[in-house]
Amino acid sequence: MMKDYYTWTYPDIPENVSQELRQLKSSLVVVGIVGRSKCDQANKMQAFGMEPPIEHKAKEGQVQCYYKLGTSSLLLHFETTYDEAILGQMIDVCMEDVETPFDFDSFYERMRCRFVRMMLLALHACHIVVYVETGQTFDPTLVTVFQLLKFAREQHLMQFLPQMLRETPSARMSERARLCAPRILFLFENFPRDEPKTRECVSAYEFQTEDCIYELLRHHNIVTNSSSSSLVALPNNKQFVFFNAHEQLHEDKLLKAIDCLNQAMYKPDAKEEEEDLEILELAPFEGFVKPYNLPVDDKELEKQQYKQDHTVWHFLQRHVQDALLGCFDEGSFKQHSQQGQFQLLNIHEWHNYMATLHKLLVENAKDPNQETSNEDYKLFLKSFDESLNYEKKFWAHLCELGLKKGIAAYKNAAPANYGNSTHRQLLADATVAFEEEGRGPQAKAALAKMAAICQKHWQDGRQQCEQLSLRSHPCTLPKNLPHEKHNSGVIHISSCNCGRTQGRREDPFNLRQANYEFYEHIAQMCNLCVKVKQYQLPIFEPSVSDYRAAAFEAAFPLLHTGKSGAPQDEDGEEDAEDEEGQEQQQPAEEQRQNTASNGCSQPLSPTFGSDLNMSIAGFGASLNESQASSEQLSNSEQNSTSSGTSSADTENELVVELQELHAKKEARDDAGPADAFSTSTTEYLPGLVHTVSNFGLLPLFPSWSLACVGPSSIYSHNTGLQEHFQSGFLSGANFLLPWDVQLRLVHAPKQQHHTHHQQQHLGKKQQRWKKQGDRLSLKIFVGMEYECSRGHRFMMCAPDRVLRGGADIERETCSKVVHNNMPLYYPCPCRSQTSYLAQLMRIHVVTPKAPVNIIVDPKVCVGKGKYTFTLGSIVPPRLSQSAYWIIRLPYVYQGDDVLIAPPEKLEPDDPLAGGYLLPGMFGVAETDPTLDLNEPGRMGASAAGNFTRI
C-alpha cells in the first residue's frame, strides 16, 4: 500500500520533499505533536493515519517530520520523556547504576525538566501544538508544566534568545523569538467505553473538557488577554478538544491480520429457492429490480457521515486554514495583537530558525559548561534544571521552617543539665514540632541536621555524668564539672542490719556504698545496732600500704579450669576415683547407714538430697578431717539402742553425736586454728566471696551481717514482730514460721584411759540428759524477709506466697521455706501503680533453749547459676542458744568483675531467674562450752565438722 505522506528524522530532509515544500513558499504551517504514548515506537501520529518506518527506534529529543502531499502543514513529532518507551529507557539506565540508589523524586524532576525543554522548542518552532493524551480525562499536572514553560520563557529565554537570534539568519524572529502565540489543541486517543458514541454525547464530552481546560489555563495565567504575555492561545468559538470515539488506535497487528484473513475466507451462501430461480430467468439482465445495497434511513446516513467527518485530520485542518487565512489570533485575545506577531515562513527560513533553536535549547544543553559570551545563556545552561525544580525549593523552605521550630522547641524545654534519656525525649518532641511544618524528600536530611544541632547543644555544658549506679540509674551531676561522689537523685528506703531503724539511702554507685557504708552510717542512728552482738566475718587485712585488687586469673583460677573446688594434683584425682569406685560397690544398706551417720547431713525430705553436695562444699577441708570421727560415730550408732522405740518413730529424726570434753579439745588441737589457712595480705577480692573464688583472697569489707539482736523472748508468736522492734512490715506479714526439729542423741564410746573423776562427772551429765530422754524436740522460728525500695517489708510462707497472717502458718509451712529454693526477688504486694520488686534482705532465726547450737551457712545462687555466694567464713557460724539472730544479705551482688544487676521485672513463669537462696542452710551441733562463739578465728577448723545439717 502506497503512503500518501513523507516521513524523515530531523534535520535530514529528503531533497524531493524539500522541493515540494519550497513550492509552498510562505504558506507553510508548522504543527507540533507532543504528549504521551504507549507504543514501542513512541508514535503519536496514528490518529492522523501516519506512522514511522519499521526500523525507527524511539530516542529522547528526536524529532520525526511528516508531510502529506497537497497540504500546507508540516507535522513535527517530538519524542519526549512523556513517551513510555523513552521513560523505560531512562529507568533502565538508572537501574544499571547499582552504586547509586534509585531516587524517585530526583528521577521525576529530571524527566519533567527534559520534557519542558522539548516543549519550549515546540512552542517556539510551531504555529500549532497538539498535545496527545492517552487517558480519557485532562491531566491536571499539565497545568504545572505550562507554568514552568511560562517561567522558563520569561525568566530565561527572553533574556538571551532575542539577542542571539540577531546574530543568525533568523534575525527577523528576534523580537518575539517565536512564530506566534501557538494555538494549543488537545487530542484524546480514547473515549470512555461506557458512554454512547453518538454526535451529541461526544460533542458534550468535548465541550465539557474544553470548559475545564479553559478555566484552568485562564486561572493560572497561561492564557491571558494579550498575545505577548500568553504562553499559548486558545481559539474563540472553535473546537480545540478532540476525542477519538470511532477509530481503534494502536491495535494488535496480529489480531488485525487474523481478522482480515477471516473476512477473506468468508463466502455467503448464494443458494436461492427454485421459484425465485424461475422468476430470475425472465429478468432482462442480472440484478434486475434488486437494490444495490440495503436500504439505509436518514439517521444511519447521518451517523456514517459524522464518522467520516469526525477525524483528527479534519479537526486539525480547520485550524491550519485559520493560519493560512491570517485570522489566527482573531478572537483569541481581547487586546489586538501587534503587527508582525504571527509569521509564516518558507521552508528555508524555517529550517534555519529551527536549527538555531535546536542548537541553543537541546544540543548545547548536553554540556552545561558550553563556552559562550552571553552570560544569561551561560546561566541558562547551568541552572535551567535547578530553576524548574520548584518542589525541591518548596520542600527545602518547609524543612527550614520545621528545622527552626524543632530546634526552638528543643532548646526551650531543655533544662540546665539532663541525661541521655531526657535528650532522646526532647529530641522526639522536637521531631514532632518539626513535622508540623517540615515534610518532603528533604525531611530526612533536615531531621539529621536537627539531631546534630540538638546533640551539640546538649554536649555544650549541659550533659549529665550519666555514670550508671548499681541499680542502673544514671548520675545527674554535670559531666564537665568535677565531682567526688556520683548522685542519681534516686532515694531508696532501707533498714539497718538489725532491722529496727529505717532510713533513706542514696542510690549506690559502688559495692562499698551498697553493702557496707550505708549500714555503718545508719547503725550510728540506731540505738539497737550499737548494742547488738555482731559476728565478725573474715575480711582482708593488709600488710603493706600498696595493696591492690587481685587480677581476674589470680583471683578466680577455678573458672578457667571448670572446677568447683580447690585444685588437686593428679594423685589426689586418682585417689578420688578409687574412693568413688569403692563407694559404688558398697551395699545399699551400708550406704544408707553411712549417710545417716556421717556427721554432716541427715535429710528430712527428698528435696534436700539434690543440694547436699553443694552445701557440703562450703565447709572446706574441715569435713574431710572429720571422716575418722564419722566412722567411729557410725560404729557407735550401730551399737546404741533405744528401748520402746520403733524404727518408724526414728525415720525423720536427726542424729547428734555427743563427744567427751577432752575428745573435743584433742580434735580441735589436731586441726589447728581456722586462721591456719593462708590468706593474702597484699591482694584482696574485688567482689563477693563465692564457691569458686580462691580461699586465700578476702574482701575489703563484709557484705553480709550476722547479729544477735536479743534473747528469744523478745519475739512473741501471738503478736509477731512489733513496729517498735522491726519497723516497716506490712500488716499480717510480720510473723516468723515455727519449725519443729526432732533430734536423737548418740554418745561417743568412752576411752579406757580416762580418769575416774572425768567418767563420774560426765556420767552425771549424761544421766541428766537421759532423764530427759535420748530424744530432743527443738522449736526454731525462721523468717525469710523481703524488702522493696519503698521500705515495705514482709515475710514469705512459701517460695511463691506472701505471708498474710497467722492463719497462713501451718505445721509444715516452715519446711516449704527452708527445704526449697527461695527466690531472691519477688513482687512487692504493696498497692502502687508501679510494680516494685522486693529483695530477700534478711533471714530471722530464733534459736531454742536446748544443749545444741544452730549453725547457719546461707548460699545465694545469682547470675543464672554462675555464682553461688557465701558468707566467706571457713567455719560456718554457730548461733547461741535461746537468742534472736538476724542474717542481713548483700544489697548488691558482684561476681568476679561484673555487677549482677537485678531484673527489671520478674517473669511469672520463672520466678527464680533473678537468683535464689539454696535450701539446707541450717545445721545443728552439740553445744561446746569450750568454744568462744564471738571469735570464730580462734575456733578450730574441725569445730564445725561434727554437726548435722537440718
Swiss-Prot record:
Pfam families referenced in this protein's UniProt entry, alphabetically: Smg8_Smg9
Superkingdom as given in the UniProt entry: Eukaryota
Gene Ontology BP terms: nuclear-transcribed mRNA catabolic process, nonsense-mediated decay
Bias type Acidic residues, positions: 568-582
Biased composition (Low complexity): 624-648
Keyword GTP-binding among record annotations: no
Function of the molecule: Involved in nonsense-mediated decay (NMD) of mRNAs containing premature stop codons. Probable component of kinase complex containing nonC and recruited to stalled ribosomes.
Record keywords, A-Z: Nonsense-mediated mRNA decay
InterPro entries per the UniProt record, alphabetical: SMG8-like
Transmembrane residue ranges: none
Family matches, as PANTHER family: AMPLIFIED IN BREAST CANCER 2-RELATED, NONSENSE-MEDIATED MRNA DECAY FACTOR SMG8
Annotated spans, Disordered: 560-607, 624-651
Polar residues: compositionally biased ranges: 593-607
Similarity field: Belongs to the SMG8 family.
Protein name: Nonsense-mediated mRNA decay factor SMG8
